[in-house]
């Protein structure tokens, strides 16, 4: 009995490790805007659903008409995060998955980017709403029903073109298309890869069509921190895309193929979006930020260090100067995996001091490729001709062949 009692006492004194049960984290898709909350939920649902669907050897005609649709009806459940009733419809899921793959986008990374609340950004065009993903890799744009219809027609030609070109294109990279229904209101949203860099600041921005009539930025637009300027502003600024003969040849080959493709589809209204990152200006900004940090440290040292001087190796200022110098040297480095639209100027791409000229990084892409030249556009062209005269080269609305020729000539003249 004594032995049993001793054993029980020994066991009672033995320390037992307590295990805390870890529950898997659940995405809440919490957002102030219910539409964006549903968008994030929809991306998460549709991408995860695709992970269980076999990748076909080739896409069939039905894949360009297919869709996935889900209706959610909740009662007193998760209402603090999502609307009680909503619908999500994804168009052509297999087609867009294939496009993402061809553009080198992993679905897991795509999911991570778009299940964090995006932020609203200043629209490049009137009417549509634009959002930027939290990591700045993707742009979400709202579409009209007419644009969605055009997108379906365009997609049937766009996908084989991307395949034939091995994704070597300046056309928008369309990655997903959704219809979201919240409070009985339907919204269409398309996901596009961001033309600009996630880490390199764009200091100047132009939207170029190659036409001259009514092609100046408005006074309201110019009030923005980085306004979107237009053709006449570009010419007045005397800007040149300085990438050299070899760079020009490669760019014009890609641009020529894209524009020929659009012209054959009777598409007009597209433009070249040009963003310019000024490396010298970025360097100045980085040095100014460094100087401000050092100033703050000096104020802190004089007020709170008690007059005790640190030796140089221990000084936080010394460490900060080294890290700031490294930051400045890395300030304008292109990431080839992310900055796919980036082209360095001749001076930026060459060794230090070997080539004169502006140290710029250019971001270029064709935008707005869903305007079909039909009866409405023909009427618009006639109206503008009456107003401005028969100078077709100066009017933005023109027949597809004239539009493409003028567009390419303008860009060709802008490159040196």
Kindly give the residue locations of the regions a language model identified:
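Residue-level recognition of beta-strand microenvironments
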Residues: 177-179
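Long, low-complexity eukaryotic regulatory regions
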Residues: 1-128, 162, 171, 181-416
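Active-site-proximal segments of catalytic enzyme domains
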Residues: 107-175
């Amino acid at each position: 009995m004594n032995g049993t009692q001793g054993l029980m006492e020994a066991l009672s004194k033995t320390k037992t490790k307590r295990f805390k049960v870890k529950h898997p984290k659940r995405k809440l898709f919490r957002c102030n805007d219910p539409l964006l909350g549903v968008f994030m939920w929809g991306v998460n649902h549709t991408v995860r659903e695709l992970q269980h669907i076999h990748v076909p050897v080739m896409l069939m005609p039905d894949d360009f008409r297919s869709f996935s649709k889900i209706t959610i009806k909740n009662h007193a459940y998760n209402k603090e995060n999502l609307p009680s009733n909503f619908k999500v419809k994804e168009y052509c899921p297999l087609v867009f998955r294939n496009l993402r793959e061809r553009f080198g986008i992993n679905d897991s990374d795509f999911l991570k980017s778009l299940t964090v609340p995006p932020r609203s950004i200043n629209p490049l065009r009137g009417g549509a709403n634009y959002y930027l993903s939290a990591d700045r890799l993707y742009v979400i744009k709202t579409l009209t029903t007419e644009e969605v219809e055009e997108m379906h027609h365009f997609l049937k030609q766009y996908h084989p073109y991307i395949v034939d070109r091995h994704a070597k294109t300046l056309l928008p990279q369309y990655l997903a298309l959704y219809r979201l229904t919240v409070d009985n209101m339907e919204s269409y949203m398309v996901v596009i890869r961001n033309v600009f860099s996630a880490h390199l600041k764009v200091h100047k921005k132009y939207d170029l069509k190659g036409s001259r009539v009514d092609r100046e930025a408005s006074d309201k637009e110019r009030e923005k921190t980085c306004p979107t300027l237009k053709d006449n502003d570009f010419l007045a600024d005397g800007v040149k895309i300085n990438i050299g003969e070899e760079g020009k040849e490669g760019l014009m080959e890609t641009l020529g193929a894209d524009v020929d493709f659009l012209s054959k589809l009777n598409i007009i209204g597209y433009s070249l979006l040009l963003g310019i990152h000024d490396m010298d200006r970025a360097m100045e900004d980085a040095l100014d930020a460094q100087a401000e940090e050092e100033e703050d440290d000096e104020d802190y040292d004089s007020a709170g260090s008690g007059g005790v001087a640190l030796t140089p190796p221990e000084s936080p200022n010394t460490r900060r100067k080294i890290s700031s110098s490294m930051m400045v040297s890395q300030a304008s480095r292109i990431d080839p995996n992310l900055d796919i639209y980036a082209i360095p100027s001749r001076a930026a791409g060459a060794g230090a001091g070997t080539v004169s000229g502006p140290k710029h990084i250019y971001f270029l892409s064709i935008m707005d490729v869903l305007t079909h030249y039909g009866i409405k556009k023909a009427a618009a062209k006639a109206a503008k001709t009456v107003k401005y005269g028969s100078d077709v080269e100066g009017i933005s609305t023109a027949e597809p062949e004239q539009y493409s020729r003028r567009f390419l000539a303008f860009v060709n003249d802008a490159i040196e």
